[in-house]
Structures are given as C-alpha cells and as structure tokens.
Regions:
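Rossmann-like NAD(P)(H) cofactor-binding subdomain of soluble oxidoreductases
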Residues: 85-147
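Glycine-rich helix-loop-beta junction characteristic of Rossmann-like nucleotide cofactor-binding loops
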Residues: 1-2, 105
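Glycine-rich Rossmann-fold phosphate-binding loop(s) that bind the pyrophosphate
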Residues: 13-14
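N-terminal Rossmann-fold NAD(P) dinucleotide-binding loop
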Residues: 17-18
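Phosphate-coordination loops involved in phosphoryl transfer and adenosine-cofactor binding
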Residues: 4-7, 109
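Conserved N-terminal Rossmann-fold NAD(P) cofactor-binding segment
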Residues: 3-5, 26, 30-76, 81-90, ...
Length: 147
C-alpha cells in the first residue's frame, strides 16, 4: 500500500492537530482538517501561524472546514481533540461528540487513530463499542483502530 496516495483527515486543529496537519501535508499527503473554531480554520486556509519548521511549505494540499461531510474523501482519520480533566478524570464529552459526528463518514478499510489523551482501555472500551453499535463495524475487519 502506498500511503501517500491516501487522504488524511485530522479532527481538532489545536496544539497537536494543526502541526500534525502541516507536517503530513508537507510530506505530500492530501490533508483535510476539521475544527469548530473559525480562527483555527482560517489560520489553516490562509496559511497563517505555520510552524517555523514548516515555513516554505505553504503550497501543500491542506484545507480546513467545520463540515464533516468532506471526510468522505479520507482514508485515515486522526482525532486530536482535548480531553480536559475534571476531578482528576478526563472529560470525554468532546471526543464523544466527535465520534457521533464522525460515524457517518468513517469508511470500511479506514484507519482511525485516537491521538487524544484518554485513560488506558478507553479507546477499546468506548470507541470500539460505539462503532460496533452505531455502524456494525468490527475493529480489524471493517476498519483499523490505533491509539
């Protein structure tokens, strides 16, 4: 499999997601970024706030949007949303909302990577079970899951 022919979707364009999006795009991948923050989207689309290490790579294939439907074009989805802590427990509300929004656009044979910080076992416990229930997708048969 030649991965550079694959399209990558990155959900969450903050401190982790934006640099990852720029780096993947600078290496030749087509990258679609999703965020609900207009400023983050504008920074990507106007090529402002590019990490200094990636200056000069402004002409890469990278677009950002709030619209999850553009994820229909991607083969790899990386989730980089915050999981702030409350009472020493991660708040998974944002991750759960993303999974709800994402479920209709995850294709068979996709790779889903959860980059967000979650407790050990949470990816398997929540994400795997959610996709089985909502889509009937079985991990390692219908899609691949990494964390």
């Amino acid at each position: 499999m030649i991965y550079k022919e694959k399209n990558i979707g990155i959900i969450g364009l903050g401190y982790v997601g934006a640099p990852l999006a720029y780096l993947a795009a600078s290496k030749g991948y087509n990258v679609i970024g999703i965020d609900n923050d207009d400023t983050a989207i504008e920074n990507i689309n106007k090529r402002t706030n590019i990490p200094k290490e990636l200056k000069g790579f402004e002409n890469f294939k990278l677009v950002a949007s709030k619209d999850y439907t553009i994820l229909q074009k991607v083969d790899i989805i990386i989730v980089c949303v915050p999981t702030p802590t409350k009472n020493n427990k991660p708040d998974l509300t944002i991750l759960k909302n993303v999974m709800q929004d994402l479920k209709d656009f995850l294709k068979r044979d996709s790779l889903l990577i959860i980059e967000s910080t979650v407790a050990p076992g949470m990816t398997k416990q929540y994400v795997k079970d959610f996709l089985l229930k909502e889509k009937g997708f079985i991990v390692n048969e219908d899609y691949n899951l990494a964390y």
